[in-house]
């Protein structure tokens, strides 16, 4: 599991995948979500604009990201 620290209230799912270098572009992030390859808190998520908040866990391609607040 990898911890990702954000300084804002939330980060959009597609931006998180790019920030964590799990996808190279927003288009790639959109495609892997549309294909049902991303899970948020254990549930498949296809909404690229989903707001990911501290405490959420995102899983993709064998990686699990735990989002935490910088504060």
Feature map (PLM): residue ranges:
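A detector for short, charged/polar N-terminal pre-domain segments
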Residues: 1-8
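A basic, amphipathic helix-loop patch mediating RNA/tRNA/ribosome contacts
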Residues: 11-54
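C-terminal structural segments of small proteins and small subunits
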Residues: 44-71
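Generic structural motif recognizing short loop/turn segments at the entrances and edges of beta-strands
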Residues: 2, 36, 63-65
């Amino acid at each position: 599991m990898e911890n990702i620290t954000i300084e804002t209230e939330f980060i959009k799912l597609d931006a998180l995948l790019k920030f964590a270098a799990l996808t190279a572009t927003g288009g790639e992030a959109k495609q892997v979500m549309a294909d049902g390859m991303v899970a948020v808190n254990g549930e498949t998520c296809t909404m690229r604009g989903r707001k990911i908040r501290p405490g959420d866990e995102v899983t993709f391609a064998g990686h699990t990201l735990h989002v935490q607040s910088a504060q």
